[in-house]
A protein has these predicted regions:
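Soluble N-terminal domains of membrane-associated systems
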Residues: 1-94
Length: 94
């Protein structure tokens, strides 16, 4: 499994992700609920640290952060095109 898909799954899946934003050496992800986030599963190879605060999960991936964030956003956007319109209001927007 690609790192971006592992991170999406660990963040509670597509429906739990509100926003993905690359921030220098980390990926800032706003989630609907922290209860759906599996922090242990976020600690895959390539992840240096995980910081959780409020509805935000910051995933530190160093120099690879921008590329991983771009792959996560592309994956989320591709799902949006295959998701029924009524589900989009419940779905995350990246």
């Amino acid at each position: 499994m690609a790192i971006e898909q592992a991170l999406i799954d660990a963040l509670g899946g597509y429906l739990n992700i509100v926003e993905v934003e690359p921030c220098t050496m980390r990926i800032r992800v706003q989630v609907k609920t922290q209860l759906a986030v599996d922090e242990a599963a976020l600690r895959v190879d390539g992840v240096l640290a995980v910081v959780r605060s409020g509805d935000v999960v910051q995933i530190v991936c160093g120099a690879n952060s921008d590329g991983i964030a771009a792959a996560m956003i592309a994956s989320i956007q591709s799902v949006a095109h295959d998701t029924p319109v009524d589900a989009l209001s419940q779905r995350a927007h990246a």
